[in-house]
From Swiss-Prot:
This is Putative F-box protein At5g36200. Gene3D superfamilies: 1.20.1280.50. It holds the Pfam family F-box. PANTHER family: BNACNNG10540D PROTEIN, F-BOX DOMAIN-CONTAINING PROTEIN. InterPro entries: F-box-assoc_dom_typ1, F-box-assoc_interact_dom, F-box-like_dom_sf, F-box_dom, SCF_F-box_component. Residues 1-46 form the F-box domain. It comes from Arabidopsis thaliana (Mouse-ear cress).
Length: 471
């Protein structure tokens, strides 16, 4: 019997016994096996088994005091226990999430973003912003060099992927959306393509703002809570609110998506994902001290529908124990439980509030906060086999092409010298070479800094002065 003729159940059993780092190599031996290993429902089931072996346990990525951890949370046990020590043991550190050679970003991480098993970590150091993408389950990381050094903390960051006709082929991308505008409603955002290791800049107009930094990734796209602003970017009284989606396939923002409620400027609205399949939104009413959580039944870049109210809680008993200005949360639909992370009113302790729709409430002290300005962040974590494409091969090919063009221009210079100073007519071919070199060196100035090493700056500037061709 040929490998391709084996039943799917047997193939799944075989692949599930293969070490994680060897799955791709094994799958490449057979087309059917490769198709199965790239099926996202199978990989989600496979990697879910490898990490979460205990029943009723869920995995989350949690950032506390600028450090990132993988946590296991047993909400079923929490709901049953009354003893504080047993409840605290139900929220366990699995491990420090990643180990990098440069500890700066681990000790100064301020933003985490999860998409399809990949994590985007962002940190600010004395040397500027640092970006790293990691698949903690495969132990793969990739540092990304920012296009500019003067990014701001208020900028929005996200990671997603471009969808192909073949669902197993995806191009991972990162979005950097700048808050500042240079002329009324004209804004700009940058997209980093993992395959080409390049940045693209886009300008657009908008009539909305994103009051909160943290978005949520679902099915490769990113969603934010947004409010309307006027034509000059100024806030208006009681503005309409809605969701806005960035589609990584079209590289455009979509239309407004309606919410099941209307919020005011003093209300708190936070987004979260449910197994990276549905969107959950939390609203805490400022004047009523009431918290509501809604969950979508369907969500796409241009369409959304909502389920009935998932949870509604009177927050008055929590006024003196918890602050809602900067919180994050995740839910368990099966247990009808929500976990809300934040700080106490003095900003000295990290707190987790476990709330059930049957009136259950329990507060867990996660320890002293060493950074009063860094609020806990949490997002559900779904391990995956997504490989992080490294930039080395792309850059190596780029160097080869660049060296070839540099050689062509130097040959042209040598030809000019042989004319003993007499005027020499530049050939069409030489002009093309110089034009290509100009463009590539300009690109490398920010990408890999090869311009100054390939051609001295004076030759770089003078070499094209005689050429009528403009880049």
């Amino acid at each position: 019997m040929a490998m391709s003729d084996l039943p799917n159940d047997l193939v799944e059993e075989i692949i599930s016994r293969v070490p994680v780092k060897s799955i791709r190599a094994v799958s490449s031996t057979c087309k059917n096996w490769n198709t199965l290993s790239n099926d996202h429902s199978f990989t989600r089931k496979l990697f879910g088994k490898t990490i979460t072996t205990k029943e009723n346990e869920c995995l989350v990525v949690m950032m506390m005091d600028s450090k990132v951890y993988l946590m296991s949370v047993n909400l079923h046990r929490i709901h049953k226990e009354n003893d504080d020590n047993n409840i605290k043991s139900s929220i366990m550190h699995k491990a420090k999430l990643i180990s990098l050679n440069d500890d700066d970003i681990l000790n100064n991480t301020y933003i985490i973003f999860h998409c399809n098993g990949l994590l985007l970590l962002l940190g600010f150091t004395d040397d500027g912003i640092k970006l790293v993408v990691t698949n903690p389950h495969l132990g793969q990381t990739r540092w990304i060099k920012p296009r500019k050094a003067n990014y701001q903390f208020c900028d929005k960051y996200a990671i997603g992927y471009e969808k192909k006709k073949n669902n197993s082929l995806r191009t991972n991308k990162m979005l950097l959306f700048h808050k500042e505008s240079f002329c009324f409603r004209i804004y700009w955002f940058e997209i980093y393509n993992f395959n080409s290791a390049s940045w693209n800049v886009f300008y657009f107009t908008r009539d909305w703002e994103l009051p909160y930094s943290q978005g949520v990734s679902l099915k490769g796209n990113t969603y934010w809570f947004a409010r309307e602003i006027n034509i000059r970017g100024e806030r208006i009284d009681d503005p309409p609110d809605f969701l806005i989606c960035f589609d990584f396939t079209t590289e455009r923002f979509g239309p407004r998506l309606h919410l099941p409620f209307h919020s005011h400027s003093d209300d708190t609205v936070i987004l979260s994902s449910v197994r990276e399949e549905q969107l959950a939104v939390l609203i805490k009413r400022f004047d009523l001290w009431r918290m509501e959580i809604w969950v979508t039944t369907k969500i796409e870049p241009k369409e959304v529908s909502w389920n009935k109210l998932f949870l509604a809680v009177d927050m008055i008993p929590l006024i003196t124990a918890f602050q809602f200005c900067n919180v994050s949360f995740f839910i368990d639909e099966k247990k009808n439980v929500v976990v809300v992370l934040g700080k106490d009113v003095l900003n000295t302790r990290n707190i987790a509030n476990i709330i059930g729709n049957d009136g259950y409430f329990k507060q867990v002290d996660l320890g002293e906060s060493t950074n009063k300005y860094c609020y806990p962040l949490v997002c559900s974590y779904v391990p995956s086999s997504v490989q992080i494409k490294q930039a080395t091969r792309v850059m190596h090919h780029h160097h080869i092409v660049l060296r070839a063009v540099v050689r062509a221009v130097r040959d042209s210079d040598r030809e000019r010298k042989l004319n003993n100073g007499r005027e020499h007519k530049i050939s069409r071919r030489t002009r093309i070479h110089e034009r290509i070199l100009f463009r590539m060196l300009k690109l490398d100035e920010e990408a890999i800094g090869i311009r100054s090493r390939s051609v001295p700056r004076d030759r770089y500037q003078q070499g094209f002065a005689s050429s009528p061709c403009r880049a």
